[in-house]
Amino acid sequence: MGKRRAKRLLESYEANGKRLEPGVCVMLRPPSPKTPSYIARIERIESDAAGRVKMWCRWYYRPEESIGGRRCFHGVKELFLSDHYDGCYPEAVEGVCSVHNLKDYAYLDVVEEEDFFCRFEYNASTGMFAPDTVAVYCKCEMPYNPDSLMVQCEDCKDWFHPECVNLPSRGVESMKDFICPDCS
């Protein structure tokens, strides 16, 4: 039996003009042009004896790819970090992206096409999430969605969707003080 040649770990690799290294999030070309890019985090990059390079990636899932599907509180740019790993080739990289935590994403002045956020880890085989509970807001008791406008009560400091407290959406951002129905 022949000796198996060792693979060599690479600190970084350049593909399509992009510097790739462990920890970097990438957008990967899907099989169909109608499908959005796949998003993954590079865990390691290795080269075999013939010089072929392969990245080991941890996948992010979109809500609609999970067992529970997309819910109304999921943001448009929301992803779940999964326990699903695969080998990928650098040639499939379309670009580099940023996957922020929810708090950092909410404070972005401008959300670019390459910006995403993640607040859950997802076990692809069981369909379970971590954390399995999340804070809820408003009278509707829904988790925070950065795509939905909310207003804070000056007294109790709770957050509300304008439509849930009978406020017109227009002009809410310029309101000086808001007092919720429970505090007024």
Segments and roles (model prediction):
Residues C156-E173:
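Cys/His-coordinated zinc-finger cores
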Residues M1-K18, G51-M142:
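Epigenetic mark-reader domains in eukaryotic nuclear proteins
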Residues C140-N145, D155-C156, C164, C183:
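Short Cys/His-rich metal-coordination motifs, predominantly Zn2+-binding knuckles/fingers
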Residues V24, K34-S47, M55-W56:
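Short beta-strand-centered aromatic/proline hotspots
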Residues A135-C138, V151, F178:
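Cys/His-enriched microdomains
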Residues M175-C183:
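Cysteine-rich micro-motifs
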